[in-house]
Amino acid sequence: MNQNKLLIDIGSTYFKLSANGCVEQHFRDFNKDIYDDLKSKCEETISKYQKEDVYICSSANGGLSTLIIGLSKSFSLKYATNIAYNSGINIIDTVLYSHIKESSIPGDLIDVVIVVGAIDGVKGVFGQELLDYLEKINYSNIVYVGNQDDAHFIQQHIDNVVVLPNIIDHKLHIREEELKEYLTNLYQADIVGKEDIKHLYDITSNQIYPTPYIVNKTLSLLDGKFKVVDPYILIDIGGATTDIHYSKDLIMDNILNENEYDRLVFKKLGVFKSKESLIFSAKNNEFVYELLAYLKVTENIFQEQSEKALKVLMQLAIFLVLCKVSSYNKSYITLKLNALNSLIFTGGITKVLNQEDIQNIVSFFYKKILNSSHNPSIVMDSNYDIWTMAIRN
């Protein structure tokens, strides 16, 4: 790609521009449309570029949420959960169909419901119980990826359902491509479909992509820019979400096969828009008060609006996300963190924490949670080089 390009990232809290090797960052004004805010602060820079030379990515939607309904924990729920996580979708809950009558009803709007179960050739798996449950929940999209013999019943009784091939083949192997593509496209459509984002096509003629998607596509190139050693994890902590990208050889139970690297998006682990949910998650972690004492602060820090409070929130986000992908927490994909060689940090966190701040938290996590003296190297992407490299490529 020609170097004379303007690169723009629209985040949930900040937007940043990269031109001629220089990066500028601006805190968003939430009283303004994104386009108007961007133009008011960066008009001089933007006006120098033709629309075909402007490239934009965005993570401003904070990710999508899903509820998964499946027949078994060993196959349908397990397979669909892995595909959803690796498509950057946040899983609100999973429902075992045999317990659907007793299952709780989510209060929030679900972006997409996934229904899955049984191999092709098995019929009559889903019935009225499914329809009754769906009547009680509020969702925007629904996709069926179960046995094809029940597809007619599903289409006949559920409005606007999308039917895709079964994610479980006749040998009980996973078939991930169609569902992963559907979820990825849904995630992208949610971003570019927002009025704020659509307006940005006034300044670019190029496709607007989700930021986590393009960053993930660049991970194999990182060793040419940074001193990293596989296997590694890239953590991007922002205002609304925390994204984690990882080498697939770190996965304890790797059932997906398409990409060398995959990602998780934690929708409620941000330090600005998701601050309250981050604090809630922290207070529900049994080690958080010990961690606060280790950082020489009390829980009163949660009420503060200060630079110190922001640093502590960033450190908590690191600790919580490592907990979520470790053997301590079985709700997410478990990564072999004792095999980790490098931990890369990018995003706003590099403007708030220094290497020592991060190393202290990582060391605490390994000693307290994993009972290990393992010490992966910490790599800081302080100038957003990963994002710049991603969108250029």
Can you say where each PLM-predicted feature lies in the sequence?
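Nucleotide/phosphate-binding catalytic cleft detector across ATP-hydrolyzing
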Residues: 1-7, 22, 29-32, 40-231, ...
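Asp-based phosphoryl-transfer active-site loop
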Residues: 8-13, 236-240
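Short glycine-rich, Thr/Ser-proximal phosphate-binding strand/loop in the N-terminal lobe
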Residues: 11-37, 78, 86-93, 255-277
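A structural-propensity feature for long, helix-poor, extended segments
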Residues: 108-112, 269-304, 308
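Adenine-nucleotide phosphate-binding core of ATP-dependent small-molecule kinases
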Residues: 204-211, 299-327
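Glycine-rich phosphate-binding loop of actin/hexokinase-like ATP-binding domains
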Residues: 227-289, 354-378
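Short mixed-charge
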Residues: 250-254, 327-334
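Extended, charge-rich intrinsically disordered regulatory tails
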Residues: 286-295, 316-321, 369-373, 380, ...
